[in-house]
Design a protein with these regions (language model features):
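Charge-rich, low-complexity N-terminal segments
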Residues: 1-59, 93-101
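Ampiphathic alpha-helical segments that act as solvent-exposed interaction surfaces
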Residues: 2-18, 85-94, 115-146
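Short, well-structured alpha-helical interface segments that form or flank functional binding sites
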Residues: 8, 41-46, 59-63, 81, ...
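Generic detector of ordered, mature protein regions
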Residues: 22, 26, 75-81, 96, ...
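Short, solvent-exposed polar/charged micro-motifs at secondary-structure junctions
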Residues: 39-43, 109-115
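Generic structural motif
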Residues: 53, 69-73, 115-117
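Short, internal acidic amphipathic alpha-helical interface segments
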Residues: 65-111
Length: 146
């Protein structure tokens, strides 16, 4: 098992996920910081985020999800309400641990948290598959929501 830095991991996962998606879904852009990556289509404020959470959330905790971070809390709330109405479908596809909730600054999100006790290169592929599966499930709903 080869250790990997968080900054390399958050860049590698979206790149690997892209290859697992249909042509229609693989053309996203990526913005990265040392602790997170944001994969998005037409609006950067609506993105799929993979983030290493601060230690106050637990050691080696991660989050993956669809974040609604537009400048208007009303838009973010409307998107959250739409996804909340489809949460049974989302959980059926992605797992019961996915939640939809209000977050910070008027932002909202549909997400899951998980722990990787040790971050290794071998975790890139399964995490990319998890991200690709989330995009395949959530992006059609996001596009319908507007």
């Amino acid at each position: 098992m080869g250790a990997i830095k968080v900054s390399a991991f958050v860049k590698a996962v979206p790149s690997a996920a892209r290859g697992l998606l249909s042509d229609e879904l693989r053309h996203f852009k990526v913005a990265a910081m040392p602790w997170l990556s944001q994969s998005y289509y037409d609006d950067k404020s609506i993105h799929y985020e993979l983030v290493k959470l601060p230690s106050r959330y637990g050691e080696n905790a991660w989050e993956m999800g669809l974040h609604f971070e537009s400048k208007t809390a009303e838009r973010n709330s409307a998107l959250l309400r739409y996804f909340d109405r489809h949460l049974f479908e989302v959980r059926d596809a992605l797992g019961d641990d996915w939640v939809a909730e209000i977050w910070d600054r008027g932002w909202t999100k549909v997400y899951v948290t998980f722990v990787y006790p040790v971050l290794t290169e071998e975790l890139v592929a399964p995490t990319a598959e998890r991200l690709a599966h989330a995009i395949r499930t959530l992006e059609p709903l996001r596009r319908l929501a507007g």
